[in-house]
Amino acid sequence: MIKKYVYGEPFETEALTETLETAEGKPGYGEICTEDGFSFTYIMDEEDIVYGLGESNRGINKRGFIYTSNCTDDPEHTEDKHSLYGAHNLIIVSGKETFGMFFDYPAAITFDIGYTRMDTMKVTCENADLKLYVIEGESPYDIVKQFRHVIGRSYIPPKFAFGFGQSRWGYTTKEDFRKVAAGYRENHIPIDMIYMDIDYMQSYKDFTLSEENFQDFPEFVKELKDQDIRLIPIIDAGVKVEPGYDVYEEGVKNRYFCQREDGSDFVAAVWPGDTHFPDVLNKDARKWFGDKYRFLIEKGIDGFWNDMNEPAIFYSTEGMKEVKELAGEFAKDTEGKIHIWKMQSALRDVANNPEDYRRFYHNVDGRKIRHDKVHNLFGYNMTRAAGEAFERIDPEKRFLMFSRSSYIGMHRYGGIWTGDNKSWWAHILLNLKMMPSLNMCGFLYAGADLGGFGADTTRELLLRFLALGVFTPLMRDHTAIGTREQECYQFENVEDFRHVIGVRYRLIPYLY
């Protein structure tokens, strides 16, 4: 049984597809206070296990740490990090009492699960405007089953998406992709996808192709499809500020970008330099941005991955101005009044600065909503934009789509990958523990960067990562520019890699 409790004036996230009546009174578990923001306090039994929180740090049992659902671009997935890329506010208590809770709140929300006090779970957020769903069941399995029913059917990709994929930030030319295809073919290692990172674009502009490297792109897509390999391009959240660039011009003309309080388009720097963010919470802007995927679909593309959609901010115009002013004062400081640590801190904190997320707004049905109040919905609605567009473009076809940032509800439109991990043994365990927690929240098509995105892998580490990938729906080897080449055929005794990936292909009839 699921009961819905409403506090204040919550923003409609559309996380659920089922309509539930609002319950009266108070939940039968813990204590709730709405006097200064929102807080839920529950005294845990010594034997209680707490599951959930989807893509979050540490173990499957979440006791003993503080987690904050606040979608964050942070490639350093160390044990002390409280936030990663997703916001999945489902917890399940299993023990003396067994129940689940979904805190449908799109801004930052903190879960102190036995950290401050070993026996106390405390959930807090700044504003008392949220929906709380309390799920009662006989077991965690029963609770997950009920929850999955009310949030709607999970995204299922096309069959080829269950095959093996190779990716690297740094593949730049057709020859780079041909070399990868040939390397796998010549070593008799099956492969279904090669991913295109940002270098395929013209100056990192969404829905463009490098004029130098990808002329006759439809023919190149067909060339690889004839080898049973699909190209899967990346799409980033920021639209480059560049007069004459059609996506930019259309967005400015129709006011489809997120704006400052004064109505001007908000400017943040990401890979292309100065960018605007499409206002994907505005249904008209969401439709417009989703329809842009047609540019590549019409050239034969069957899948995409959405990135940088927390949204990541390298710096804002306002933030960089503050850093430059401090740098100017630092340069003139001959008496040591400004400590070097202050300068270093300013440079470090300019990226993804919380102040920047308070500087721009969304237009939602004529209402101006400050971004930080709905921050965790951006990646969800960017991927929703694509998913809804796919239905319009070709309703009979399944497209591959997965995203870095997410919120519960996005599971209906795409899968996720767990972001910029490292070539560390510890991250095999971390990524393994994330998978069941993500499944609880509806994300079935999920996986990690096998081999590790950052740092240099080793032969043994890559093999063990691939062994994990055999059992994750998304099986992709991905690594960063500047790291060791990580394609399976780069290592000795290639037959071991052929065997591991071959096991996956023997499982596909059972997966699909």
Regions found by a protein language model. Name each.
Residues 2-6, 82, 109-113, 118-121, ...:
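Non-catalytic C-terminal accessory modules of carbohydrate-active enzymes
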Residues 167-169, 177-178, 183-187, 192, ...:
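C-terminal substrate/ligand-recognition segments
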Residues 135, 165, 222-225:
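Domain-wide signal for the mature, well-folded portions of proteins, strongly enriched
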